[in-house]
Design a protein with these regions (language model features):
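Extracellular low-complexity, Gly/Ser/Thr-rich intrinsically disordered linkers
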Residues: 62, 129, 414-485
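Active-site groove signature of glycoside hydrolases
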Residues: 239-271, 328
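Conserved, mostly hydrophobic/aromatic
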Residues: 53, 151, 214, 257, ...
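Tryptophan-rich substrate-binding surfaces of secreted polymer-degrading and adhesive proteins
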Residues: 7-12, 24-112
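N-terminal export and membrane-targeting signals
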Residues: 1-17
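Substrate-binding surface in catalytic domains of secreted glycosidases
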Residues: 166-184, 262-411
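Glycan-recognition patch characteristic of GH18 chitinases/ENGases
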Residues: 114-245
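Active-site-proximal beta-strand/loop segments in catalytic clefts of secreted hydrolases
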Residues: 66-68, 122-129, 153-158, 215-219, ...
Length: 485
């Protein structure tokens, strides 16, 4: 039985029990223990870092941390917050330092708090079939197909105001032998469709719960969105026709727009204005109807930053969900450092740029009126690192990017987990120091922390960039699936 199905069965049983009690939760006190106070743990301190399982007392009540936290006052974070009340305790010492929580939910969770229907999406790159030797079959052999709900196929291009197929050989023509194919059947020379698309069709036949979404743009191909925004209806028409081409009609369940970045700078700079993104998404929704319309968006939580410029709040009504790219905050493009985590969950001491963390970005997006259930937390299946580093703690100087398999300064998790194992955590993510190199990346343990936080915020789930960075047994995909409600 699939792990996904098992979780859904458990969730369904829980839901049924909830209905039987008319939506109420009843707690019956044990007459033998109800009057016995729990021994108090050391008093909560606002300056101390707590991780999942740590305990603290506050105002005569014992609390247990569900995940990483600092500065969040017990008793103020609510049912879905970080602190779980264990009841009254015998004796409590008030903390010597107190402050308001640095990260509190800005709204009650609007997503499903436990139905097993959270989204676990991941990007599959078209070019990964070459140097990375990562194919659709790897999604099956790794066990990831059991846990994923959605695969984002990256990337289609945007040219002359239209959606276009990028690498036709990889997408529709590459012939697969029997041992390379998802179903063990070799492609023939005369079949009308081969390549990734045919393999994905086979994958969906084997795992019908998986949705496949075609993503357009990305860092390299976002330059064409400005022209597309000049005639959104024509753009939407071209995208719809491409996704429903007769050769692969039925493969794609919707479209994903990865515009980096509307009304801001990425590889190129866009000056379309704050309404352009909204107009584009509105046109796509009108054309695609009930099919998925999603977008990968910036996680720049700085004041006046990319979130403020993109128009994401007004566009939210037209999308099924946003995939918030909560990674790539810091890296060896600043070759001298300071070393800092590229995918921090929360703010941390010595943070080079305030607002470059997941919690701040999510809070800012919520403040725009975007429902929590329409926000997915981003997880990177890779690390970013420096070389020439002399200290293991974050904040050290460096001499340049650390060597990587495909690009300096970046390396897959599947390599780093053995090459440079994690030595500590900062801001809710892991870092590693080895042989003068300093890396930051997520591990199954930090993913557990992040997904617990995502659940507490009522987020719609999580997504990852990208599948080839995971281990051969899909350790990170599984960690996300296990962590989401």
């Amino acid at each position: 039985m699939r792990r996904l199905k098992t979780r859904r069965m458990i969730a369904a049983i829980g839901a049924a029990l909830a209905v039987m009690t008319a939506g109420a939760i009843y707690t019956v006190a044990n007459p033998f223990t109800a009057s016995a106070a729990i021994a108090c743990s050391p008093a909560w301190s606002a300056s101390k870092v707590y991780v999942g399982g740590d305990t603290a007392s506050h105002n005569g009540t014992e609390y247990r941390a569900k995940w990483w936290t600092q500065g969040e006052t017990p008793g103020t974070t609510g049912e879905w917050g970080v602190w779980e009340s264990k009841g009254a305790c015998g004796g409590d010492t008030n903390p010597t330092q107190s402050q308001s929580p640095t990260q509190q939910p800005t709204e009650e969770p609007t997503g499903n708090p436990g139905g097993g229907d959270k989204i676990n999406a991941a990007y599959f790159t078209e070019w990964g079939v070459y140097g990375r030797n990562y194919h659709v079959k790897n999604i099956v052999s790794s066990g990831s197909a059991e846990d994923l709900t959605t695969i984002n196929y990256a990337f289609g291009n945007v040219k002359n105001g239209q959606c276009t197929l990028d690498d036709s050989y990889a997408a529709i023509d590459k012939a697969y032998t029997a041992d390379q194919s998802v179903d063990g059947k070799a492609d023939t020379w005369d079949q009308p469709l081969r390549g990734n698309f045919n393999q994905l069709i086979k994958l969906k036949e084997m795992y019908p719960h998986i949705k496949v979404v075609w993503s357009f743009g990305g860092w390299t191909y976002s330059g064409g969105f400005g022209q597309a925004a000049q005639n959104p209806a024509a753009f939407a028409e071209s995208c719809y026709n491409l996704l429903h081409d007769a050769r692969w009609n039925g493969l794609f369940d919707g479209i994903d727009i990865d515009w980096e970045y509307p009304n801001a700078c990425g590889l190129t700079c866009d000056t379309s204005g704050t309404q352009a993104f909204t107009n584009l998404m509105k046109a796509l929704r009108a054309k695609f109807g009930s099919e998925l319309v999603t977008a990968a968006i910036t996680a720049d939580g700085t004041s006046g930053g990319k979130i403020d410029l993109g128009g994401y709040g007004t566009a939210a009504q037209y999308v099924d969900y946003y995939q918030v790219m909560t990674y790539d905050y810091f890296g060896a493009w600043d070759k001298d450092g300071p070393t800092a985590p590229h995918s921090a969950l929360s703010s941390f001491s010595g943070q080079p740029i305030a607002g470059f963390d997941s919690a701040t970005a999510i809070a800012k997006l919520k403040s725009l009126g975007i429902p929590s259930s329409k926000l997915l937390l981003g997880i990177g299946y890779y690390g970013r690192g420096w070389t020439g580093v002399t200290q293991s703690a974050p904040g050290g100087s460096a001499t340049g990017p650390a060597p990587g398999t495909y690009e300096a300064g970046i390396e897959d998790y599947k390599v780093l987990v053995s090459k440079c194992p994690a030595t500590g955590t900062v801001g809710g993510t892991a870092y590693a120091y080895c042989n003068g190199e300093w890396w930051s990346y997520d591990t199954p343990a930090t993913i557990a922390t992040k997904t617990a936080w995502a659940n507490s915020q009522g987020l719609g789930g999580a997504f990852a960039w990208e599948l080839s960075g995971d281990t051969s047994n899909g350790a990170l995909v599984s960690a996300i699936a296990n962590g989401l409600d």
